[in-house]
């Protein structure tokens, strides 16, 4: 009897939170609007999350699953994923609302989390990592390696880089963003100048279960920039000479007098 009363008390404490649920949970779904054929639907995700782990709180904003910003709660400011978004990141008019969401999320973890512990299945996603270059590969020219992490849940991870099995320093922060289906993805960037002998590895550790995913990168299908320029010049020169020869042959052919019967 006492156990049932405790469960009932826990449910009563959750009743004031029902107003926070999305309206689609409480009312029938509205009819789908009929948009003109030349219009497209887009999705902007503003996702605040908190957890008993690192990072303890986070905010990501994405447009059609392409991350635009994350929020640095230590500085109370947006951080753009790409430099092109820096001007938009200066807008801080919604900072009080973001801080309220943070405090409310942390309160939910503290007050309601223990009551639901053991009653809700724990979801886990084993992260999948892959590494690629941001620009076409040319030896000797600065480029950026991108470590893309998918199937991430919960978003507790550590990303490290190695070059020939030696730890690399100086890489940028890890950007975590939410995607459809309440899962997450992450990006880590490393600036480098590629060489033919390079071997890089991106090591992703899922903090909640210490699962580690490793993705390797080695140069493939690349030509040194000097050789590439020489090859392109040679091809262009060859095509030019061929065009001249074909032109001369056609001129001679059409100016040749026709033989009579």
Curated annotation (Swiss-Prot):
Q: Which residues lie on this side of the membrane: Lumenal?
A: 27-233
Identify the residues that the record assigns to the Ig-like C1-type domain, covering every copy: 121-215
Per UniProt, subcellular location reads as:
Late endosome membrane; Lysosome membrane
Membrane topology, from the record? Single-pass type I membrane protein
Q: Where is this region: Connecting peptide?
A: 218-233
Q: What does this protein do?
A: Plays a critical role in catalyzing the release of class II-associated invariant chain peptide (CLIP) from newly synthesized MHC class II molecules and freeing the peptide binding site for acquisition of antigenic peptides. In B-cells, the interaction between HLA-DM and MHC class II molecules is regulated by HLA-DO.
Protein name, entry field: HLA class II histocompatibility antigen, DM alpha chain
Source organism of the structure: Homo sapiens
* Gene of this entry: HLA-DMA
């Amino acid at each position: 009897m006492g156990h049932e009363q405790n469960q009932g008390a826990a449910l009563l404490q959750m009743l004031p939170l029902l107003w926070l649920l999305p309206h689609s949970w409480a009312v029938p779904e509205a009819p789908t609007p009929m948009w003109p054929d030349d219009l497209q639907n887009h999705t902007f995700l503003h996702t605040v999350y908190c957890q008993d782990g690192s990072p303890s709180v986070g905010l990501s904003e994405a447009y059609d699953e392409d991350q635009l910003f994350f929020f640095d709660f230590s500085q109370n400011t947006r951080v753009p994923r790409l430099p092109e978004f820096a001007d938009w990141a200066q807008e801080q008019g919604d900072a009080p609302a973001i801080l309220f969401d943070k405090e409310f999320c942390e309160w939910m973890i503290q007050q309601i989390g223990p009551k639901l512990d053991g009653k809700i299945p724990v979801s886990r996603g084993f992260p999948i990592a892959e590494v690629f270059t941001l620009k076409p590969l040319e030896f000797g020219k600065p480029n950026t390696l991108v470590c893309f992490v998918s199937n991430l849940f919960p978003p507790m991870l550590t990303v490290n880089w190695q070059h020939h099995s030696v730890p690399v320093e100086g890489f940028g922060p890890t950007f975590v963003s939410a995607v459809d289906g309440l899962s997450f993805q992450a990006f880590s960037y490393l600036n480098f100048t590629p060489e033919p002998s390079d071997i890089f590895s991106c090591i992703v550790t899922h903090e909640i279960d210490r699962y580690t995913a490793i993705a390797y990168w080695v140069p493939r299908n690349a030509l040194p920039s000097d050789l590439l320029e020489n090859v392109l010049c040679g091809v262009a020169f060859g095509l030019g000479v061929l065009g001249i020869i074909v032109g001369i042959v056609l001129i001679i052919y059409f100016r040749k007098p026709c033989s009579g019967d």
